[in-house]
């Protein structure tokens, strides 16, 4: 379970493929300068509907991208809930990208589904 009111960097423990060795645990490193499509999905389990918000932040060397959702609209704690974030990021060679999450308020009961079908990160050079 994640502690509340704390920002956590997410470590992804399974790689489907890594063409160039550009991803390690929680950090994607751009191998060359270009535009990258970056995406992440968080598959939440046991969300506390009394939490103020859940956010997912995609942090690159040049910019932060953020999505925030408020679970207080649920009439009960959802067992499953998904958040995703996508960005086309301008990255220089050796710039990095990481995913951070924060649960504000409520109880420390939420966790992430460990299956890579539900919780994942992807980075791809576009141009």
Language-model-detected regions and their locations in the chain:
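Extracellular jelly-roll beta-sandwich "head" domains, especially the C-terminal globular C1q domain
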Residues: 1-127
């Amino acid at each position: 379970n994640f502690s509340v009111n704390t920002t956590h960097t997410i470590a992804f423990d399974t790689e489907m493929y890594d063409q160039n060795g550009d991803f390690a645990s929680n950090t994607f490193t751009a191998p060359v300068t270009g535009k990258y499509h970056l995406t992440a999905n968080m598959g939440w389990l046991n969300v506390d509907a009394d939490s103020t918000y859940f956010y997912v932040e995609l942090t690159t060397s040049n910019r932060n991208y953020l999505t925030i959702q408020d679970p207080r609209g649920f009439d009960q704690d959802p067992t499953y809930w998904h958040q995703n974030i996508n960005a086309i990021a301008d990255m220089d060679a050796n710039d990095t990208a990481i995913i951070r999450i924060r649960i504000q308020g409520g109880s420390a009961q939420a966790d992430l589904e460990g299956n890579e079908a539900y919780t994942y990160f992807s980075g791809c050079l576009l141009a």
